[in-house]
Amino acid sequence: MYTANEILSKVNEYINNLTYDRKPQSLYEPIKYVLSLGGKRIRPTLMLLSYNLFKDDPETILSPACALETYHNYTLLHDDLMDDAPLRRGQQTVHVRWDANTAILSGDSMLVLAFERMAQCDSRHLSEVLRLFTVTALEIGEGQQYDMEFENRNDVKEEEYIEMIRLKTSVLLACAMKIGAILADAPAKDVENLYKFGEQIGLAFQLQDDYLDVYGDPKVFGKKIGGDIICNKKTYMLINAFNKANARQCKELEKWIGCENFNHEEKVAAVTELYNSIGVDKMAIERINYYFDEANKYIAAVNLPDERKAELLAYAQRMLHRKW
């Protein structure tokens, strides 16, 4: 079996060696650029780890695994455009380096390339894999729409937020786990348990992102802390702060949310102090651990020896306790 680091190395090598021979090059240069920016490559790594539970040649499914990374980066490219974000992983975003029209066209082409790469899977499983990938892509769009709609609401409930991040983030990790298992000819029950494992891990990962945006170390996290607070993004932290705050705390939160002219550091400090007094930091940690515990139940139900599952569990544990 491969370690997660060995798999990550294979993924990066495969992506770095991808060629784009079609023209115009101006359409494909932004695609190469986006995929060259690195990242954690969680989705292809999970797919290959899932496959490797059952078979020892995960390098044979690098194309469909990297299809997920292509798709994920397509969503980031369009997210950056919608958010007018200037940087991604410390580098200029596509719409800044080129322009908005290029970001749209190159992003659309990445979506097509993702399906082309996924279609290179074993023909025996092509129909099932493409059906799952298509449904997942639609769910992610639904999650993004909910996310945008939540920006105009101060009454978002925790369960609504969890469903939004399940759609926007979690289902792609679940899809990665399931496709890996399908391509490895895993038993149907194991396939479904691995999907649920990925779903629960995805929820934990997203809540960890919410938490780190407030409480992470900026030197390790890779970006300034408090970005979500500054732009009033509806996160697990903010939603539960509104839901749990007393009248005084709620009034203070509303003041900062409605304030248009403010000092960034002052707002981040004030809202973080409110989070601390309300206790949403502890709530987030408890919820992250809950989803990880749920994920462990599903992986425990997979009918394989524990030593066969050890690398996948260790990888998930490292990601859960990451500081970036």
Indicate where each model-derived feature is located.
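All-alpha prenyltransferase/terpene-synthase fold signal
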Residues: 1-324
